[in-house]
Amino acid sequence: ANAAQYKLGATNAKCFDVKNACNAFITSLEIANAYIASGNVETVLITSGEIMHNYIKWDYNDKDEICETNATLGFGDGGGAILLQASEDENVGMSTRFQTNGNYWDVGVIWGGGSMYMADPDKFTMKNVDPDMVQKNTMRAAKFYFDSMKKNDIDIDDVDLYITTQMGKYKIHQLADTLKIPHEKIVVQCDRFGNTAAASMPIALTRALESGELSLGSGQRVVMFGAANGLTFGYASFVL
């Protein structure tokens, strides 16, 4: 964050990094919204970038090893940014919600790079998560998202675009089917850019704005569904 501030010449801006795996962007939205609501700041810039190819395992010794780590083959690099500003329009507010399931804190973790496993190359990749655990928590996540929308009095049909963590096309469509969301209303871009983790959401939002699918000041509603290692579910809803 300090480097971004320096390169932008934003010398008066307070800045800090936010880390929450694939949910870092939604976490940043929540923090930015709280800052703006407090009246302490009027404008917040959120930047999100990922270099995920560093964690892809390229060398395999046997078929079993491929089956253990092939989820990393879908990783991709990318970055995006969003600028938030205070508004007097009561119809353009933001709501966010999180659920942390700390009993899964060690699932889907890349252990290498820290002080514990600095020089162990086998720790610089991520092992696949147990399919039964994934299925169980996909259903839990869907319930969390549904409850979050209900809490905000938002119906499925009220939303113009859904943006999710890009864990895979099959999983995204499975979530859409569970919540009865039309496939054309939910973003799938992992087939083009891979899973860019926390950068997925700002990339998707930017592409939708550039294509004309969304436009600022239109009153369109966007809902974001996040899922991150740890295990955390995140939700954000806002009107453009």
Which residues are covered by each model-predicted region?
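Claisen-condensing/thiolase-fold acyl-transfer catalytic domains that form or cleave C-C bonds
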Residues: 1, 6, 11, 18-37, ...
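Short coil/turn connectors at secondary-structure junctions
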Residues: 10-14, 38-44, 69-70, 78-79, ...
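Short beta-strand segments
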Residues: 19, 43-50, 75, 84, ...
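Short, well-ordered, mixed-charge alpha-helical segments that flank or form enzyme active sites
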Residues: 25-27, 52-57, 102-105
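Flexible, glycine-rich phosphate/dinucleotide-binding loops
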Residues: 53, 90, 102, 171, ...
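Condensing-enzyme catalytic core mediating Claisen C-C bond formation in acyl metabolism
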Residues: 60-135, 143, 236-240
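Conserved short secondary-structure transition element at the edge of the structured enzyme core
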Residues: 152-156
